[in-house]
């Protein structure tokens, strides 16, 4: 899976993108975010309040129950606001 991180999430996690193999128990966005939190303090800090992040899978906004696969591209970013 290709993961992309944007804005302050990128700064806290320490990378803009990475390729990872999903553990077999991770099959949806919620499971992915919770698994990522266990990968280290930067991930835990960036993802501590899941209400402050949005997720797109293959460039489509999705909710926490959306199913994911190893071949997906997942972008994690803060909510977008206009002005």
Predicted regions and their residues:
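Ubiquitin-like/PB1-type beta-grasp interaction modules and other compact soluble beta-rich domains
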Residues: 1-82
């Amino acid at each position: 899976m290709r993961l992309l991180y944007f804005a302050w999430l990128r700064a806290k996690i320490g990378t803009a993108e990475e390729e990872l193999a999903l553990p077999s128990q991770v099959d949806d966005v919620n499971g992915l975010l919770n698994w990522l939190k266990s990968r280290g303090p930067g991930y835990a800090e960036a993802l501590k309040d899941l209400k402050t992040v949005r997720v797109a899978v293959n460039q489509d906004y999705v909710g926490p129950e959306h199913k994911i696969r190893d071949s997906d591209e997942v972008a994690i970013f803060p909510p977008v606001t206009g002005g």
